[in-house]
Curated annotation (Swiss-Prot):
Record protein name field: Large ribosomal subunit protein uL24
Record GO biological process: translation
Gene3D superfamilies in UniProt: 2.30.30.30
PANTHER family, A to Z: 60S RIBOSOMAL PROTEIN L26 FAMILY MEMBER (PTHR11143)
Region (Disordered): 114-149
Entry keyword set: Ribonucleoprotein, Ribosomal protein, RNA-binding, rRNA-binding
Cellular component GO terms held in the UniProt record: large ribosomal subunit
InterPro entries from the UniProt entry: KOW, Rib_uL2_dom2, Ribosomal_uL24_CS, Ribosomal_uL24_euk/arc, Ribosomal_uL24_KOW, Translation_prot_SH3-like_sf
One Pfam family per UniProt: KOW
GO molecular function per UniProt: rRNA binding; structural constituent of ribosome
């Protein structure tokens, strides 16, 4: 996302770090599931609280959960179930960058969000994306067993 006419990396970084909230919201985009891409006729959507996402990278790779919080200041999201334990035993959400998740079931309660999808030529009615097939689950279990050895 380019805000300034300058091509100097220094000024691009400054614009990025000092971006206002309405521009930070655009930076919080995540890719859509391939089935949703066809249905919505777009590649990505900004992440919102209530979206169901699948984590694609990092320690929680493969985990699916609902977005609990979107932190625009730190450009991170918090997903239900992706928690770590502090030294005192308290469970806290692990911050995840939205580029590392895939939206599998968007929250379409907001009429403005529906309009965004309609504008791009998609249909905003959505059913849940089917779960991973049994074969994929078995392959994942085998990979986990190999990594434990």
């Amino acid at each position: 996302m380019r805000w300034t006419k300058s091509s100097q990396p220094r000024k691009q970084r400054k614009a990025f770090f000092n971006a206002p909230l309405h521009k930070r919201q655009k930076l919080m985009s995540a890719t859509l599931h391939p089935e949703l891409r066809k249905k919505f006729n777009r590649r990505s959507l900004p992440v919102r609280r209530g979206d169901m996402v699948r984590i694609m990278r990092g320690d929680f790779k493969g985990h699916e959960g609902e977005v609990v919080e979107v932190d625009l200041k730190r450009l991170r999201i918090y997903v239900e179930g992706a928690t770590i334990e502090r030294a005192n035993g308290e469970k806290v959400y692990y911050p995840i960058h939205p580029s590392n998740v895939m939206i599998i079931e968007p929250n379409l309660d907001d009429p403005m969000r529906r309009k965004i999808i309609e504008r791009s030529g998609g249909t905003p009615e959505v059913e849940a994306v089917p779960e991973k097939s049994e074969e994929e689950k078995e392959e994942k279990e085998k990979e986990e067993e190999k990594s434990e050895e």
